[in-house]
Amino acid sequence: MIYLKPITYDNINDFAGTSYDTMSLEQKHHMIRESVNKIHDESYFEFLVIYEDNTVIGFMNLYAHSEHIISCGPTIKEEFQNRGYGFSAETKALEYAKDRGYTIAVAGVDENNKSSIALHEKLGFELERKYLGREDRTIRLYIKAL
């Protein structure tokens, strides 16, 4: 069974196998500090570690866009992908956000990320619109009432 815990500096070496591994040590420290302080760009931010038993499976970030709207997105380590961890972790993160008073979840998903599209649709997110993101990539904006 998986569970989520706030990240600590003890997790600094747990980024291997994720996109976060390419960050410098200074960037990792900065991100952890923002999570501990629960603020990024003057908005609520929290970075959670996804565990199964005592094994780090991946990470979950939560970012508030307003008092009621939050986005949360899992990053699952390569060796644990395609096993349902993303679904379980995001389900728990959405419950976590709802318990903190958020009423709407949003997700910006790259049009080419088929697994993330499938995940969000399975979780009941609805496609709100598409737009051009960085590098002219098409982004699908999903929305879900909590």
Task: Locate the predicted segments by residue.
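Conserved catalytic-core motifs of GNAT/GCN5-like acyltransferases
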Residues: 108-109, 124-141
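Active-site acidic-Proline motif in GNAT/NAT acetyltransferases
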Residues: 77-79, 83, 111-112
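Acetyl-CoA-dependent GNAT
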Residues: 9, 21-71, 77-79, 146
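Conserved active-site alpha-helix within GNAT-family acetyltransferase domains
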Residues: 87, 111-129
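Conserved GNAT acetyl-CoA-binding A-motif
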Residues: 97-108
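Conserved acetyl-CoA pyrophosphate-binding loop and the N-cap/start of the following alpha-helix
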Residues: 80, 84-92
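A conserved beta-turn-beta hairpin within the catalytic core of GNAT-like acetyltransferases
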Residues: 64-72, 81, 101-103, 134-138
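A short beta-loop-alpha structural element at the N-terminal edge
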Residues: 1-15
